[in-house]
């Protein structure tokens, strides 16, 4: 009998500006285009777990759309909140009904997660957590949606990466909004 269970992958799926920023200088993400053709719902159906840094979790991990927001946005957030959430934090350590907090032993804890049965895992961010995962060799797939805007300043995607990373491009897609999505695999 063959074993059809494959190890779960850590996928960094992120919007980024042409000049490499994931947020503007004041944390703004108003430049991010939610293009329905990008298949974000399909991506969310491919995962069952989301990994957040504490700041990202505080901002987005518990986000509730406003009553006046479109139904499509409400459905999207409902799908996001249906996923199991892990928060990486040096300061918070409680487990609540919204998330499981991980304070140390990141490499070991994430490798345990990857070996558990389930769908792929979304590395949501923020930038510091992304850097930690890259430096530990934990990112399996980079799925970057490059938006047609140059901010000039803001929070860069890659900070303090300590090694050269050779990637293999596996897919590119372009959208009428001007967004270009590039998918790379890394066998770090």
Swiss-Prot record:
RNA-binding keyword on record: no
Membrane-related topology note: Single-pass membrane protein
Transmembrane segments: 121-139
InterPro entries: DHFR-like_dom_sf, RibDG_C, Riboflavin_Biosynth_HTPR
GO molecular function, one term: 5-amino-6-(5-phosphoribosylamino)uracil reductase activity
Keywords: Membrane, Transmembrane, Transmembrane helix
GO cellular component terms, A-Z: membrane
Pfam families in the record: RibD_C
Entry's localization field: Membrane
GO BP terms: riboflavin biosynthetic process
Matching PANTHER family: 2,5-DIAMINO-6-RIBOSYLAMINO-4(3H)-PYRIMIDINONE 5'-PHOSPHATE REDUCTASE, DIHYDROFOLATE REDUCTASE FAMILY PROTEIN (AFU_ORTHOLOGUE AFUA_8G06820)
Family statement: To B.subtilis YwjB.
Protein name: Uncharacterized protein YyaP
Organism (species): Bacillus subtilis (strain 168)
